[in-house]
From Swiss-Prot:
Disulfide-bonded cysteines: none
MF annotations from Gene Ontology: rRNA binding; structural constituent of ribosome; tRNA binding
Assembly information from the UniProt record: Part of the 30S ribosomal subunit. Forms a loose heterodimer with protein S19. Forms two bridges to the 50S subunit in the 70S ribosome.
Lineage top rank: taxon: Bacteria
Pfam (any one): Ribosomal_S13
Gene Ontology, cellular component aspect: cytosol; small ribosomal subunit
Functional description taken from the UniProt entry: Located at the top of the head of the 30S subunit, it contacts several helices of the 16S rRNA. In the 70S ribosome it contacts the 23S rRNA (bridge B1a) and protein L5 of the 50S subunit (bridge B1b), connecting the 2 subunits; these bridges are implicated in subunit movement. Contacts the tRNAs in the A and P-sites.
Disordered: annotated span: 91-122
InterPro entries reported for this sequence: Rbsml_uS13_C (IPR027437), Ribosomal_uS13 (IPR001892), Ribosomal_uS13-like_H2TH (IPR010979), Ribosomal_uS13_bac-type (IPR019980), Ribosomal_uS13_CS (IPR018269)
Record protein name field: Small ribosomal subunit protein uS13
Ribosomal protein is among the record's keywords: yes
Similarity field: Belongs to the universal ribosomal protein uS13 family.
Transmembrane segments: none
Length: 122
């Protein structure tokens, strides 16, 4: 099993897809990485040679912030916004959508399950 940036890549998948299992590497970055290292995206992970793995590992760790480092940075950014009391920090603290989405309806992912409020008596 090939390990890159602390992630076990699925052996049967094409390299182009397998790289996206790394947090911080999407389709675009995977293609950029393959182009820069000169490795074909059609190669299966199980068919990679050790020098190719080393080259991929060096390129990803040298050029991108991925996995733990990226998660820590994102968490620190959110923590900073909460501490300085910005609007976005307030939305994070209250568990509401941060980027201006509507909340009268929808936003159930951020707000959690619906809490029923007693209706007005006639």
């Amino acid at each position: 099993m090939a390990r890159l940036a602390g992630v076990d890549l699925p052996r049967e998948k094409r390299l182009e897809v397998a790289l996206t299992y790394i947090y911080g590497v999407g389709r675009t970055r995977a293609l950029e990485t393959l182009e820069a290292t000169g490795i074909s995206g059609d190669v299966r992970v199980k068919d990679l040679t050790d020098p190719q793995l080393v080259e991929l590992r060096d390129y990803i760790e040298g050029n991108y912030k991925v996995e733990g480092d990226l998660r820590r940075e994102v968490a620190a950014d959110i923590r900073r916004k909460v501490e300085i009391g910005s609007y976005q920090g307030l939305r994070h603290r209250r568990g509401l959508p941060v980027h201006g989405q509507r909340t009268k309806t929808n936003a159930r992912t951020r707000k959690g399950p619906k809490r029923t409020v007693a209706g007005k008596k006639k």
